Structure formats: structure tokens, C-alpha cells
């Protein structure tokens, strides 16, 4: 058996372990959410997290509670107040769902437009062309011909009745076209050029600054991007929030306005960013909450719809009530969050090479760029899109730092391997790799090591007991006899 097969098996076990951890975490997220819904104002998040951590392991499984929780998170029917929403049938361009504030925002007659004698009424079945000027209606209809409609965002439209301009932000959902409408403020310069180009121009200076950085320092990279986002958006606090292997989070870099309590270096439990929310960040990479105290707006759907309209891709989607309470408790009234999505590291290159080419670049959520503000704050779509560009460039450079770290690590390993090999050649006994300087612990990052040779055990630092090492050796020869080596995060999971 080739050496790649055991490595591939180890890689597969690691993936299975990761999937099991995510499932267990999702179950815990669901239990905490259920406790929040039931307890209301008496909900004590810290106490419950500690109880879960110190208590028995979470029972895994797709229970009804977990499924209901995921549906509740991903299929909410509320939006925020900074815009309105329409869902359109792609064939007829008729409205099949609308937010309760849409009629007022899109059809209110303005005295500045006196020629409107019979203003359109907005409801289920209304043809969206009747709501906007010919140019805007044509631009919206043009989106139907694009496989990726987001490439056109934002589309500038004008209401027939009021003449007011709106950014139309379009995406496809199951069975329909969902359009977010955000008013263009009088102080804004409307995005008349291609949306992506306009947004890139806004982020160009920050992107140039990041691209000019020398490699080799993740801290410098994070500090730079945090400073650029702070200058670009004007929020009170900006953080680079990094996820660790066990899914807990750390504030890795931070900049604040004067007088704010620093969060830098703080670690938060995995439940702080639920798995369902992480999934949504992989789908919709920029998330803005303008005012956590504002009342959410209901979305009304046609009664005869054969499918459920998902708002997962909507920029207007209202946050979960638990998160709103969490924000208010932190005195963070508004937030803007960008997902940092990087290539998933495969620990074994040979195992990776056995996979089809299209599967080699799996993605994962490295962390988040998080902006907090102590008062309501709205960031227009072109600037949000610029922040998304910036986060993408940042992610590319995070990947580069991973590669540099990997190359340096491999270089040091080869150097140490050569030194230890020379020591073994010079000495008649392998004891030199545990008794000498350097020793085997300098080759592999670890808390302890052990050598079993001639029936005797030599232990270094935080290693298992002698009897446990004998048990592990017997297990390896029995279960993994054909393996040239074994690497695992859990001996239990490895069999």
C-alpha cells in the first residue's frame, strides 16, 4: 500500500471530525436559541455557554429542534427599514411578494411630479414596469438575461410617482427574482456607471495599500486592512475577527475611535457566531445592520405560491432577535460585517492530488471584518460593495500568508530532519533524538513526545504515561499496520 493511502484516510477522518464538530455546534446553537426564545428577558448567555461547556457532550443529530432552528434562521420573512423589497415572477415580471413598506416608498405621489394622474397601486400581481420610469424598468428587465444578475448591481431606477431614485439590488432565489430597493440619499452621487467599476474605484486606494505590503506578517496585514476599512466606512470600531480550528473566535486586530473599550485579544465561544450564520456569510458576504432598535418590516407573499421565498441573499434581511439583543447589550447599534473566505488548507498534498481538479479549491470562512457603531448608521450599496472588494483582496493576501508560513515551516522541518538524521547516523542508538539537543520535539509542533525502543519508553514533557504508550503502540500495530505514519486530532476518532 502506498504511503498516500494512509494519508488520504487520515485526511478523510479529519474532514469527518470537522463535520461532526459543526453538527454538534449547530445542535448547541439550536439549544441556546430555544432557551433564548423561552426565557426572554431572563436569558443569561454566559451562564448557559458555561453550563454547556462543563456539561455532558451535546447529543448530535438532526432533531426537529435543529431543523426548526435552521429554517427559522434561514427563512425569516422580515426585513430592515433602510429599504423595501419586491419578489418578482421572472416570466411575467409581476410582484409575488412585497414588504409592507414598499407601497409607501415606491408609489407615493410627489408634488414634484404633477403629471401622474392615476398613480400605480402596488400589490400582489402588480407589474413592476408600472412602478418605474422606462429607463429603470428596462434596466431591471435586462437582468433577466444574465445568469449572474448580481453583476449588474446596483441598478439605478426612478419611481414614476415621485421621481425619487433608488438603488435596485437584484438576486435570484428559488422560483423568483428578489429585488432590494434602497433610496439614493440627496447627498450621494448616484451610481450611473457599472456598479462593480464604481465600487472598485472607491476601494482602489485601500486595495493598493494592501497589495504594497511585504509578505511574512499576518499581524501587519490585518492591522492594515482594519485601518483602511475604518477610514473608508467611518464606523466607531473595526475588527479582524479570526476563527480558530475549534470554531471559537478571536479579535486579532482592532482600531477604535478614542474612548472605546478595546476588544483586542479577546476570545469568544463558537456559539457567538452560530454555524447557520456562518453558512449565510458564505452565501452573502456583506451584512449590514443599520439600527438594532428599529422595528422590522414584514414581507407579504402571494397565498398560492408553490415555493417558499428565501431572503438569505437579501441585503435587507432582518437579523434574528437574539442577535439584535446581543448588539444592544454591547451598545453596538449598527454594524457592517464582511466575510473573509479563503482556500481550505489540505494537510496532505498527496491526498489532495487524488481529488478531481474542480474539488481542490474548497473554501472556508477564515474570519470576519467587523464594524460597530454606537448610533444608527447606513452605508450605501456602492460603498458596501467596495468593502466586499477589499475583503476579497484581503482574503487573497491571507492565503498568501498561509503559503509563506507553510513554506517556512517546511523549510524548518527539512532542516531539523537533516540535523536529527545526522545525529542518528553518528550515534549507535536512537535515544539521541529524545536526549539530545535538538530533539524530536523540535521537528513537530507538540506538547510532548515519546520513544518506544527495545521495549522501553522515553518520555518528553507532556506525554502519555508509559502504559498508555504501550497501549497506543499495540493499537497502531493492530489497526494501522500498513500505515507509514498516522496523524490525527483525536485517537478516538481514528479508531
Swiss-Prot record:
Which Cys-Cys disulfides exist here? none
In its record, the post-translational modification comment is: Contains one covalently linked phytochromobilin chromophore.
Give positions of region: Disordered.
Answer: 1-24
* UniProt KW keywords: Chromophore, Photoreceptor protein, Receptor, Sensory transduction, Transcription, Transcription regulation
Q: What GO MF annotations does this protein's record show? A: photoreceptor activity
Pfam families listed in its UniProt record: GAF, PAS_2, PHY
InterPro entries, A to Z: GAF, GAF-like_dom_sf, PAS-like_dom_sf, PAS_2, Phyto_chromo_attachment, Phyto_chromo_BS, Phytochrome, Phytochrome_cen-reg
Recorded superkingdom:
Eukaryota
**GO BP annotation list:** detection of visible light; regulation of DNA-templated transcription
Record-annotated GAF domain positions = 217-402
Q: Where is the composition biased (Low complexity)?
A: 1-21
Q: Which SMART domains match?
A: GAF
Task: Kindly list the positions annotated as binding phytochromobilin.
Answer: 322
Q: What does this protein do?
A: Regulatory photoreceptor which exists in two forms that are reversibly interconvertible by light: the Pr form that absorbs maximally in the red region of the spectrum and the Pfr form that absorbs maximally in the far-red region. Photoconversion of Pr to Pfr induces an array of morphogenic responses, whereas reconversion of Pfr to Pr cancels the induction of those responses. Pfr controls the expression of a number of nuclear genes including those encoding the small subunit of ribulose-bisphosphate carboxylase, chlorophyll A/B binding protein, protochlorophyllide reductase, rRNA, etc.
Q: Which family does it belong to?
A: Belongs to the phytochrome family.
Q: How does it assemble?
A: Homodimer.
What protein name applies here? Answer: Phytochrome A type 5
Origin organism of this chain?
Avena sativa (Oat)
Q: Which gene encodes it?
A: PHYA5
